[in-house]
């Protein structure tokens, strides 16, 4: 699928230029997470293009979402140019690291820093990539909503200084676009992830 939307409702206070990769497997809410960031950017008046690839319809299959915010025409993020990688599955982090530019940001749902292969750790260091690992699954389980790990990881990511979005803007979008029956638990997961890092 290709998403092309132009922010026309507001004139942005400042230009946002960001290329994001969101990666996971079917059933983890990768596409909903992508919507959170794209809807936030649009609400702030920015242009957005994006594309989702791979096994979206197959539960458990790889899902990779490309999202570019700013003056872009092509929706795909080329290898070595991405600013942010959000990996909702640690194995997908391995598969998608090459999308990040030197000095990029990687936030991974994983069991702890020790899961990185030594060779990958060397790659991260050599390329100046800021890598953060967060047990979002555990946080989601602790609040009784295992399917909300995506929101917990986003909350955590918003506490990282390099993340090019404001906490208040993302939270407002979650509140606005989440169906009413899931709104409370989604905000709870997001807030739990954000607080864990503060």
Model regions and ranges:
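Active-site cofactor/cluster-binding pocket
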Residues: 3-198
